[in-house]
Amino acid sequence: MNFFEFLIEHLGKFIGYTAFANFTIGHLIMIIIGLTFIYLAIKKEFEPMLLVPIGFGILIGNIPFWGAEHIVSTDPQNLQIGVYQQGSVLNYLYFGVRYGVYPPLIFLGIGAMTDFSALISNPKLILIGAAAQLGIFGAYTAALTLGFSAAEAGAIGIIGGADGPTAIFLSSKLAPDLMGAIAVSAYSYMALVPVIQPPIMKLLTNSKERLIRMKPPRIVSKTEKILFPIIGLLLTCFIVPSGLPLLGMLFFGNLLKESTVTKRLADTAKGPMIDIVTILIGLTVGASTQATTFLTPKSVGIFALGAFSFMIATFGGVMFCKILNLFLKDGNKINPLIGNAGVSAVPDSARVSQVIGLEYDKTNHLLMHAMGPNVAGVIGSAVAAGILLSFLY
């Protein structure tokens, strides 16, 4: 065989290995979605820490290659390239998503950077965080109505908690086949909190309610801050032990912060560690959304239910504040504009409360009050995930 015969024989094989030979319209759609995520993150600054890794991961996951369907490590045609192919680097990194390793580590970092003072000083705000979980159970009911199984509906419903790590953790247990769509939906709507919530908040409140001034929160002692994660862990996990991986790490991270004797550990948890895990979770979740598995009618339903759950969660938080005010004396009333902060997109939903409040009164700063239900929502979404896991696993 001379050189030209060899070249002609193997040129066709080479072309068959390229992405051009395996490209479909589905891959094009997914690449456009990935580029849109990157655009929104960079140009509009919508959750860039999340959308840049996810968007780039979508690009990685939708570069088509020959033999993508060969996933078993012993298969000689497994090139060990794709996120689903055993033995590939991406598959090893995806292990943390598939088996729920990354979400508790994210919660450890969240705990280490969260100040629960606003919640400790005004404990009734935890009820707002609980009321906002209405979105989870509302979406769960809607998903059942649309024909999803109970386990799938539970995994979809958690999108309403506005907590990406919780959504990944629960879907990895209840509906691993839908995890990519659920995770991308959760993170997408987290990024769109400043767009979704304001119209609902304005619709549900009147001008008098928007001008309510809340009493400044009292100063919380160091002892209270140290006791909170310990008591919080015991109370929540004795009731919902299945939420222990998330709640345990959340409260442990907070104790590292508040004890002040483990500052180096707290700094590591809320700095390098959470940044590394965020990169890995975003990149691998994005890479898992391949055209063949992502572009399905179920994915469309998941995104629709995700939007519905966010709106119901915002509705639940705001309306609960209005109802609670019926039983509170003047001077102790709650501005219902902080009700949306029960949706646990920290601190974005609390910032929305601040921005909308300032539109009506330039001197009425609601951020410090909104952080109470905001951090309560983090706890509430983890508890809700534990409840769903207990009933549906």
Whereabouts are the PLM-identified features?
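Hydrophobic transmembrane alpha-helices of secondary-active transporters
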Residues: 37, 94-120, 253-256, 274-296
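Transmembrane helical segments that form the transport core of multi-pass membrane transport proteins
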Residues: 233-321
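Alpha-helical membrane segments and immediately flanking helix-loop junctions
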Residues: 95-100, 107-113, 128-138, 142, ...
